Amino acid sequence: MAANVNVMAAPTPARPRAWWSHLYVQVLAAIVAGVLLGHFWPAIGTELKPLGDGFIKLVKMIIAPVIFLTVATGIASIGGETKALGRVVGKAFAYFLFFSTLALIVGLVVANVVQPGAGMNIDPATLDAGAVAQYQAKAHEATLTAFLLDIIPVTFVSALTEGSILQALFVAILFGLALSHAGEPGRQVLGLLEKVSTVFFGLVGMLMKFAPIGAFGAMAFTIGKYGVESLANLGLLIATFYLTSLFFVIVILGAVAHFSGFSIFRLIAYLKAELLLVLGTSSSEAALPSLIEKLEKAGCAKPIVGLVVPTGYSFNLDGTNIYMTLAALFIAQAVGVDLSLGDQIALLLVAMVSSKGAAGVTGAGFITLAATLSIVPSVPVAGLALILGIDRFMSECRALTNFIGNALAAIVVAGWEKGLDREALARALAGEPAPLAAAPIETDTD
């Protein structure tokens, strides 16, 4: 007599991938190739700028839809509980404010101790103010009122087409809340959006395959245009900034990670492909869609990731904050301006406001610094010309520090809100694949 017996078959282990097929290996190789090409054939390197620009545009093309789908479906799936939503936002902003302010203070303290600009004795009248005029113009446009009003889009659709992260987040929150209160039609739309979200994250995976090309072009352009030699002129400032950022990540953020139950080094290793992409393109936005996907795989609740990460890209820029106070004091020291304690406190307070809303794109930190110096009269804005030539080399460090800070913030807030699967986080950070469900096998027996 035949009988059907279900036997649980062990999942077939995946074949190990070749080492060269990993994205982080390809991006690292592309960065090295870009540096070599830009150094030995600078004319060719500068012509490759469209490769980097094109890749960043490809990624920015899908950022707004990814944020909208992640946040809207996340809020709708938890029933649009405004109390829970407000609690997440409140905790996230408390975290952002504390660590952003701490980063500003760290930059200020290091600048006073190391004094990278001391002894340069530069006459402000000899500086080329015209070289920074465009940054000053943009800085004067960046008022707090204009920033807050700009969060509200002209139309619902324009929030998804004009590339503004905060506008996309704003309409996603409203749409998610409306969806959660729409009853059965809302549940049907939610199901559809979840399917569309799967398609978009598949698109993210496709676009990431072009990351090595973008990193190669961006790095070849940077080295070809500015040259490695330009680093030597202001080497102390660059070294001070890099070491300060490293200290902030390893010691301060590392302590936060430790008390949250995981290692900052494991987190960095988990995000190595994204970090190399940020390094190559000098833009933390380039890896935003991939970061959202990886944090969800690491056990962070979808609504929390969708809220914390996009807002962090405007309000939690640790690298930019370190850079602002460090660079401002460097300029003051270089031109012989002795800032009193009161002046430095005023600088700190202004930077706390002007740093909010600095987008995670290349050059935004420089514009934000221009805005800060425009408000603080003690430091000449023309002094920006001193660091204009090397800002591009510090941009990578700003972006990397910002990126790590936002990844950590999402995990910490998820832990506070009990929206963190710690087993999934441990597996992800250890490099272990997610467990596969065993498949039943039907067999006939006589």
From Swiss-Prot:
Gene3D superfamilies attached to this UniProt entry: Sodium:dicarboxylate symporter
Lineage of the organism = Bacteria, Pseudomonadati, Pseudomonadota, Alphaproteobacteria, Sphingomonadales
Does the record carry Transmembrane as a key word? Answer: yes
Q: Entry's Pfam families?
A: SDF
Q: Which PROSITE patterns match?
A: NA_DICARBOXYL_SYMP_1, NA_DICARBOXYL_SYMP_2
Give the GO cellular component terms, alphabetically. Answer: plasma membrane
Q: Where in the cell is it found?
A: Cell inner membrane
Q: What is this protein called?
A: C4-dicarboxylate transport protein
